[in-house]
Amino acid sequence: MAELGKQHFRTGHTWIASIASLVALVFSGYNFAQAQEDPRTVVTMPLTLRLNRDGEKVSVFVQPTIATRYDTGDVEMVTGMELRLRPPNAGPGPEFFWEDSVRWVATRDPKDYDTIGVWWQFESDPAPFMVTQEEPKQPVMRFSTHGWKDAPGRYDATLTVRRASTREPIERAFCLVMDSADITSLKKPGYDEYRRDVPRRHGGGCYHRYA
């Protein structure tokens, strides 16, 4: 009887040791994967983008969150931001430039005080800025182009962040889906809001127009 109890103990001990080894392996793999990522800077895309057309110029408003991952005490200098958009067809994509940084403000219609609109105001020219863990940045950046060619479909895009500490940029890929109604809406005054969480329209994690 004592031998049977000892057998159960040994079996259980071996099983527990195996589980512990597996857990250690999982954590080791996770830590290795984390080590392969940039140890200092993290860039997170927002839930919302905004598009505006003014004649031949199309602007995309992006507000990423840029912060340092660990409390290293280091200061990161962001030296440049770039936006690339690849159209649904095989043609060349529009060439965007970082026009400026803006801020969103709420305004009331003087003829109807209960009507509130949201518009942007100039905040600053494009320029390098510093990021620390204590002070993450969420700039509203306006990227503009005069080469936008209207075409319905999925646009694959990349936001690139360049830094002073390394030549390796941080790139965040995302996608934007437009149909014919979206293209028509973009030609109207004002801006259109695109979100990644629009009910029944967020397939693939892409941004869809929120109407």
Which functions belong to the PLM regions below?
Residues 57-63, 154-156:
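Short, solvent-exposed loop/turn segments enriched in Ser/Thr/Gly
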Residues 99-146:
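Extended, solvent-exposed segments with strong compositional bias
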Residues 167-211:
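Acidic, serine/threonine- and proline-rich intrinsically disordered appendage/tail regions
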Residues 134-139, 151-161:
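A short tyrosine-centered beta-strand micro-motif
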Residues 3-36:
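Membrane-embedded hydrophobic alpha-helical segments
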Residues 72-82, 91-101:
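Short, hydrophobic/aromatic beta-strand segments
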Residues 32-58:
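Low-complexity, acidic Ser/Thr/Pro/Gly-rich terminal tails and inter-domain linkers that flank the onset
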Residues 49-59, 68-76, 130-132, 148-150:
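Short, solvent-exposed beta-strand/turn "edge" segments of beta-rich domains on protein surfaces
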